[in-house]
């Protein structure tokens, strides 16, 4: 049910994007992305690590019969988060006007909604989570379709604010209100909450900082163009997060001697290869069919998003050098390295964007993603090398070859040359691919017969 809801929400997100691209002018759509992502960014920062804390402590409290503590943990951070959103929105209303206020608050509330949805997941109420998350998006899409000829920033904002607030009230009512045990709860969660805070505090920068910085140098129409590519790229990134999230608890349960064993090393290399080819699959989809996909989720005026989509997905391919290593570091308690890796990416991205965008325009933004990813890979591999340096070198060479074939295809359209290079990489990895398939087969068999 969870994965069905994920797929449906994934689909509805692109239906929503299509509606906006058809009925909203490009510059107005850019303003929409700026204001909505501003709300998501600020709301995401003020989550303050509580989603991860919920996932840890809510199941424990219910297991031990301490439901009142669980409800206090759910409600107080969520209510405070909502109140902070109202307070922050007041200056926006005064200085930026009603449209900006409505859109900012509408998308800020999405983060408050996510706190209650995290509580549902923590209680394994997958059906309730799936229904509320899908119904919220479906309602927004239906109302936007009904209002399509009259869509403005204000109508889009009113629809989102009304629906999000309604579902916030629905989710609020699902949990009995209890605030008294909060002091005792905070004492118990404090240490883990600090860990969660450092784990999640930089996440909004990855998702939204580009939307906030682009308007400093470029018109809103350029932001809307870039966001089409970014939304597609983020869709791929979200699907690639799933195997990492599924693997993290498996690693966490292993003892030190197990992590150092030959068997674990074999399985880890198999997982790295699986993750690499899963990422390569998305990259090739965007490279060969990217123009059609852009048309599918938007209109012909956004076709210029195609090269940005390919470049963004290529940075995702570069990140395979350290993505699984990062999961290993986080799962074994190396939170400082995890935090500093994120910090390096954010700082290097902002600096390169501020330097490149005035000179290269929108391509400066896209190249900033690549530069930040390369700097982060260098930092991570220097501080937390898991494999032999020669293995990382081979992986980097594969990525370089893939980049060369992509440039050749995009400039000349020579499809056969691209297929030849990809086939050569698969041939080189063929022995490792067979091992990966064997490990995967054994894992599936073990999970079916515990």
Question: Which stretches of residues belong to each language-model region?
Answer:
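Helix-loop junctions and terminal segments of transmembrane helices
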Residues: 18, 47-64, 229, 233-272, ...
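Membrane-interface helix-capping segments at transmembrane helix termini in multi-pass transporters
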Residues: 24-35, 63-76, 85-108, 150-157, ...
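Short runs within selected transmembrane alpha-helices of multi-pass transporters and secretion channels
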Residues: 5, 9-13, 17, 33-43, ...
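Membrane-water interface segments that mark the loop-to-transmembrane alpha-helix transition
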Residues: 1-9, 35, 40, 44-101, ...
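Interhelical loop/hinge segments that connect adjacent transmembrane helices in multipass membrane
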Residues: 127, 131, 153-155, 160, ...
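Membrane-proximal transmembrane or re-entrant/amphipathic helices at the cytosolic face
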Residues: 390, 409-450
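Interfacial/gating helices of multi-pass transporter permease domains
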Residues: 17-43, 188-192, 196, 214-234, ...
């Amino acid at each position: 049910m969870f994965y069905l809801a994920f797929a449906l929400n994934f689909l509805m997100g692109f239906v929503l994007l299509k509606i906006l691209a058809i009925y909203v002018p490009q510059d107005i759509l850019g303003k929409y992305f700026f204001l909505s992502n501003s709300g998501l960014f600020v709301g995401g920062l003020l989550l303050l690590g509580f989603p991860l804390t919920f996932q840890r402590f809510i199941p424990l409290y219910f297991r031990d019969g301490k439901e009142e503590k669980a409800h206090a943990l759910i409600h107080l951070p969520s209510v405070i988060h909502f109140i902070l959103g109202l307070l922050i929105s007041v200056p926006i209303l005064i200085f930026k006007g009603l449209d900006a206020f409505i859109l900012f608050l509408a998308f800020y509330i999405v983060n408050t909604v996510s706190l209650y949805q995290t509580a549902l997941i923590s209680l394994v109420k997958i059906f309730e989570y799936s229904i509320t998350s899908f119904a919220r998006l479906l309602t927004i899409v239906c109302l936007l379709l009904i209002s399509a000829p009259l869509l403005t920033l204000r109508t889009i904002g009113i629809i989102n604010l009304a629906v999000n607030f309604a579902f916030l009230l629905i989710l609020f009512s699902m949990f009995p209100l209890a605030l008294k045990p909060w002091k005792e709860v905070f004492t118990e969660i404090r240490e883990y909450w600090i860990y969660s805070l450092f784990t999640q505090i930089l996440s909004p920068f990855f998702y939204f900082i580009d939307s906030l910085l682009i308007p400093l140098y470029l018109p809103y129409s350029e932001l809307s163009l870039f966001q089409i590519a970014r939304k597609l790229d983020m869709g791929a990134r979200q699907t690639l997060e799933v195997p990492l999230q599924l693997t993290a608890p498996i690693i966490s349960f292993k003892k030190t001697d197990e992590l150092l064993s030959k068997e674990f090393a074999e399985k880890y290399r198999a997982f790295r290869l699986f993750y690499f080819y899963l990422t390569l699959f998305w990259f090739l989809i965007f490279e060969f069919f990217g123009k059609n996909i852009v048309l599918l989720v938007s209109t012909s005026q956004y076709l210029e998003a195609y090269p940005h989509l390919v470049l963004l997905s290529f940075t995702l391919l570069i990140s395979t050098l350290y993505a699984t290593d990062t999961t290993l570091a986080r799962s074994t308690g190396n939170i400082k390295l995890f935090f500093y890796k994120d910090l390096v990416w954010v700082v290097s991205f902002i600096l390169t964007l501020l330097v490149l965008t005035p000179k290269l325009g929108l391509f400066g933004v896209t190249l900033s993603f690549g530069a930040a990813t390369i700097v982060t890979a260098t930092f991570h591999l220097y501080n937390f090398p898991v494999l032999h340096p020669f293995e990382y070198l081979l992986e980097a060479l594969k990525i370089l070859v893939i980049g060369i074939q992509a440039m050749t295809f995009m400039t000349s359209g020579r499809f056969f040359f691209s297929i030849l290079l990809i086939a050569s990489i698969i041939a080189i990895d063929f022995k490792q691919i067979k091992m990966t398939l064997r490990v995967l087969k054994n894992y599936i068999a073990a999970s079916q017969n515990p």
